[in-house]
């Protein structure tokens, strides 16, 4: 008896949830949870790996050859200098672009999770009823399209170049473990579909 009570209390001790985390089923029980989830997506997008640097003034501008780093360069701009020199397989560049790719897909997954959950909830859960529910849904759909568009412009050529080749997947379900890559035209059609849907909802 003592052994079983020790084991059960040990099991409880091992299953402690950190104070800054919440289970999904708890998060999506309230309108406030949905607001927090959407704010979490915006927060992730503002990180250095995405729009806090790489997709605004960092990597994206280096790819466009906007900077002149020959005058002054330090450790924080090493990856940008490598990109300016077209050294795409350099370890500094690969680690930065891998992190960017991973965070972008994680943000898309979070959007899809919000979309999937908010659609099944009653509007009475939200302060503004349908207006707030639709705003959360519309923003998540629009963000999904926006992130896909940036991934497409980074990892695929212009639509007129190799129109039948596939480049990136378009992920609109959660969870998604394996997704087939699509052509540029297919991705653009899905981006436009999502943007139109988001506009009609909001």
Task: Go through each PLM region and give its residues.
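Acidic helix-start/capping segments at beta-turn-to-alpha-helix junctions
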Residues: 58-67, 136
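Short, flexible, mixed-charge acidic loops at enzyme active sites
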Residues: 158-171
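Sec-dependent bacterial lipoprotein signal peptides
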Residues: 1-8
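Solvent-exposed, polar/charged alpha-helical surfaces in well-ordered, non-transmembrane soluble domains
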Residues: 32, 36-39, 43, 109-112, ...
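Membrane-proximal, proline-rich intrinsically disordered regions
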Residues: 9-61
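Short clusters of hydrophobic/aromatic residues that line enzyme substrate/ligand-binding pockets
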Residues: 14, 22, 27-28, 86-88, ...
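Conserved, well-structured interaction surfaces
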Residues: 77-155, 177, 182, 197-202
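Alpha-helix N-cap/helix-start motif at coil-to-helix transitions, marked by capping-box chemistry
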Residues: 102-109, 164, 185, 189-192
């Amino acid at each position: 008896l003592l052994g079983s009570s020790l084991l059960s209390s040990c099991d409880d001790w091992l299953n402690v949830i950190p104070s800054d985390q919440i289970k999904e089923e708890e998060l999506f029980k309230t309108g406030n949870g949905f607001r927090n989830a959407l704010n979490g997506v915006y927060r992730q997008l503002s990180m250095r790996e995405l729009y806090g640097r790489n997709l605004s003034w960092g990597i994206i501008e280096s790819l466009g050859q906007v900077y002149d780093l020959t005058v002054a360069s330090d450790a924080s701009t090493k990856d940008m200098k490598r990109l300016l020199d077209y050294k795409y397989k350099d370890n500094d560049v690969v680690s930065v672009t891998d992190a960017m790719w991973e965070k972008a897909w994680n943000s898309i997954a979070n959007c899809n999770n919000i979309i999937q959950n908010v659609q099944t909830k009653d509007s009475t859960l939200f302060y503004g009823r349908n207006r707030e529910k639709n705003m959360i849904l519309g923003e998540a759909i629009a963000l999904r399209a926006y992130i896909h568009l940036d991934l497409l412009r980074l990892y695929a050529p212009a639509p007129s170049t190799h129109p039948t080749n596939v480049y990136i997947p378009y992920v609109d379900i959660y969870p998604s473990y394996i997704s087939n890559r699509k052509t540029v035209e297919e991705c653009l059609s899905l981006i436009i579909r999502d943007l139109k849907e988001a506009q009609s909802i909001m």
